[in-house]
Swiss-Prot record:
GO terms for biological process: response to nickel cation. GO terms for molecular function: DNA binding; DNA-binding transcription factor activity; nickel cation binding. This is Putative nickel-responsive regulator. Belongs to the transcriptional regulatory CopG/NikR family. Transcriptional regulator. Its cofactor is Ni(2+).
Length: 148
């Protein structure tokens, strides 16, 4: 086992301590090891290739200079991946967006990484599910009745 020293800002330390208390960890090292494992698993899941559908969820401060314009440009640049977006005003400055994506897993991850890296984006997560690509010329001859 290796001993590592890290520096955390006060806000992040408070959040970490809250997780430790809520989950009953014996010490910070146990919590950080678990969080590192989760991050490693998530990174492995993000490296999935092939076609998938996904949900990109993020919050951002719309008052940050040029951020709404930059986000709009990114969405126009990746218009082939985005199917629908829901936008919610959380308060005077913070917004939440949920975007449904459809395409190659690597392209979806690249798009999400680009959005999440923008200054003013506070939180971001991409959830992907492997899916078959839509059939060319798919005709809609089946019912969507839940009772079928």
């Amino acid at each position: 086992m290796h001993r590592v020293t890290i520096t955390l800002d006060d806000d992040l330390m408070e959040k970490l301590d809250a997780i430790i208390a809520a989950r009953g960890y014996q010490n910070r090292s146990e919590a950080i090891r678990d969080l590192a494992r989760i991050g490693i698993q998530q990174t492995a899941a993000e490296t999935t290739s092939g076609h998938c559908v996904g949900a990109m969820v993020y919050t951002y401060d719309h008052s940050k200079r040029d951020l709404p314009r930059k986000l709009t440009q990114s969405f126009h640049h990746h218009h082939d991946l985005s199917r629908a977006t829901m936008h919610v005003h959380l308060d005077h400055d913070q917004c939440l967006e949920v975007t449904i994506l459809d395409g190659n897993a690597t392209e979806l991850q690249h798009f999400a990484d680009h959005i999440f890296a923008e200054r003013g984006v506070r939180y971001g997560r991409l959830v992907t599910i492997p899916a078959e690509p839509p059939a060319e010329g798919h005709e809609h001859h089946h019912e969507h009745d839940a009772s079928s």
